[in-house]
Amino acid sequence: MIEFYFNKKRRLITPNDFNYVFKSPNVIRCKEITILGRLNLLSFSRLGISVSRKNVKYAYQRNKIKRLIRENFRIIQHRLVSSDFVVIVNSSSMQISFKLLAKKLENLWSYYYQ
């Protein structure tokens, strides 16, 4: 049975988790979003999100973007290679609709499919 959970074990939480990905990442990017990925030794993928106040001014917009990224990851996580991912949102992400942002995110995830 496929699990569509996004619980605490599927998140990158500590600075060491993020630094592990930043050391030698596999980078996929578009103008609005950058995904850094690195293989892990676990049997599942984990996600970390970085949306800075400098790039997205208002908190409600940052939260909406993070919810969109988490939901997108939750649905496709079983198709991904067992890796740790950090999604970085750029300032140009606010110049397009959330629907288009979700489509671009899906296209970027496809590079990491098994």
Swiss-Prot record:
> What domain of life does the native source organism fall in?
Bacteria
- SUPFAM superfamilies cross-referenced by the UniProt entry: Ribosomal protein S5 domain 2-like
* Catalyzed reactions: Endonucleolytic cleavage of RNA, removing 5'-extranucleotides from tRNA precursor
Question: Does this entry carry the keyword ATP-binding?
Answer: no
Q: How is this protein annotated for GO cellular component?
A: ribonuclease P complex
One Pfam short name: Ribonuclease_P
**Descriptive protein name:** Ribonuclease P protein component
Which keywords does the record carry? Endonuclease, Hydrolase, Nuclease, RNA-binding, tRNA processing
Q: What class of enzyme is it?
A: hydrolase
Q: Which organism is it from?
A: Buchnera aphidicola subsp. Baizongia pistaciae (strain Bp)
Q: Which PANTHER family match?
A: RIBONUCLEASE P PROTEIN COMPONENT
What is its biological role? RNaseP catalyzes the removal of the 5'-leader sequence from pre-tRNA to produce the mature 5'-terminus. It can also cleave other RNA substrates such as 4.5S RNA. The protein component plays an auxiliary but essential role in vivo by binding to the 5'-leader sequence and broadening the substrate specificity of the ribozyme.
Kindly list the biological process annotations in GO that this record carries: tRNA 5'-leader removal
Q: What is its EC number?
A: 3.1.26.5
Q: Report quaternary structure and partners.
A: Consists of a catalytic RNA component (M1 or rnpB) and a protein subunit.
The similarity annotation says: Belongs to the RnpA family.
InterPro entries assigned to the protein according to its UniProt record, in alphabetical order: Ribosomal_Su5_D2-typ_SF (IPR020568), Ribsml_uS5_D2-typ_fold_subgr (IPR014721), RNase_P (IPR000100), RNase_P_CS (IPR020539)
Which is an annotated GO molecular function term of this record? tRNA binding
